[in-house]
Swiss-Prot record:
GO biological process annotation, one example: cytoplasmic translation
GO molecular function per UniProt: rRNA binding; structural constituent of ribosome
HAMAP family (UniProt xref): Ribosomal_uL6_A
PANTHER family: 60S RIBOSOMAL PROTEIN L9, 60S/50S RIBOSOMAL PROTEIN L6/L9
Sequence similarity: Belongs to the universal ribosomal protein uL6 family.
Gene name linked to the record: rpl6
Species this chain originates from: Methanosarcina acetivorans (strain ATCC 35395 / DSM 2834 / JCM 12185 / C2A)
A GO CC term assigned to this protein in UniProt: cytosolic large ribosomal subunit
Official protein name in the record: Large ribosomal subunit protein uL6
PROSITE patterns: RIBOSOMAL_L6_2
Transmembrane intervals: none
Subunit-structure text: Part of the 50S ribosomal subunit.
Amino acid sequence: MVKEIARTIEIPEGVSVSLAQDVFTATGPKGTVERKLWYPGIMIDVKDGEVVVDAEYARKEQKAMVGTFASHIRNLVKGVNEGFECKMSIVYAHFPMQVKVDGKTLIIGNFLGEKKPRFAKIIGETKVKVSGNDVTITGINKEDVGQTAANIEQKTKIKRFDPRIFQDGIYIVQKA
């Protein structure tokens, strides 16, 4: 007896998907996003209104990859339909930070009174908006939004002081 490990992902109205040479493309009201999805023994079928991810063999490794590919496809479809957003908060006690966006870089000035600014890289087509003590990161690719937030958080990591006392930084407060 062979276990059925296929996963079906429903495609909402207004979103179109295609698969060409192992590159999965999703297009929706927010934009277009692509991702290469290939693994030995994993098959992806795009049918009307749904995507089916299946494996040739029902082994542990293939079952794990079917679930991974299904999650990637769900994230791509959700991104072009609704988008992703991450909210961060600027926290400081004594030295007020100056945070601004310059192209594909977030510039963090006066962090702990430092003279040189710190630079955090903005990944992909992600948009970063700074208003007061809040930083909002939006985009259609979940991985780019998350990596941009991680880059910003890592650039304000304190290494030479006790982190229990010096809690200055830019921290993730909400992911949606």
